[in-house]
Amino acid sequence: MGRFIFMSFGFLVVAVSLSGTGAGFCCPLGWSSYDEHCYKVFNQRKTWDDAEKFCTQQHKGSHLLSFHSSEEVDFVVSKTYPILKEDFVWIGLSDVWSECTKEWSDGTKLDYKAWSGESECIASKTTDNQWWSRSCNTTYYVVCKFQA
């Protein structure tokens, strides 16, 4: 009986210590987790519109990438570069729906910026934190993201 109580207490301590560390969520097989979101790199080239549509079909709530910190960008670079080498991936930032302002396709606030130039759609270089304005009809690789 004493052993059971000790083991139960041990599991409780582990559960409490893991709360708030991201251990309370799980991404589907093949997806990577960061800051309570799931990410997946697809080795497929698509236009911006096709890439966004593709992401929405991969998982409920999934969209092209939206970035909210340089640390998040670094995480994505660490996932994309080994697979895609030096290239571009579409991110969910565009002014496709709004002619005046850029916005994320997942509806989140534009609170982190790292691009130059003006174009309807934005792509991220897989080697660094730089964003580039590109024609939405160009084909680039796809990385999808959703909140876990």
Curated annotation (Swiss-Prot):
Disulfide bonds: C27-C38, C55-C144, C121-C136
Tissues expressing the protein: Expressed by the venom gland.
InterPro entries (UniProt xref): C-type_lectin-like, C-type_lectin-like/link_sf, C-type_lectin/snaclec_domain, C-type_lectin_CS, CTDL_fold
Disulfide bond among keywords: yes
Domain C-type lectin, chain residue ranges per copy: 34-145
Positions annotated as glycosylated: N137
Molecular function terms, GO-annotated: toxin activity
Signal peptide residue numbers: 1-23
Keywords, in A-Z order: Disulfide bond, Glycoprotein, Hemostasis impairing toxin, Secreted, Signal, Toxin
Pfam families xrefs: Lectin_C (PF00059)
Keyword Transferase: no
GO CC annotations on file: extracellular region
Subcellular location: Secreted
Oligomer status and interactors: Heteromultimer; disulfide-linked.
Job description of the protein: Interferes with one step of hemostasis (modulation of platelet aggregation, or coagulation cascade, for example).
Family: Belongs to the snaclec family.
PANTHER family found in the cross-reference section: MANNOSE, PHOSPHOLIPASE, LECTIN RECEPTOR RELATED
Protein name from the UniProt record: Snaclec stejaggregin-A subunit beta-1
Organism of this sequence: Trimeresurus stejnegeri
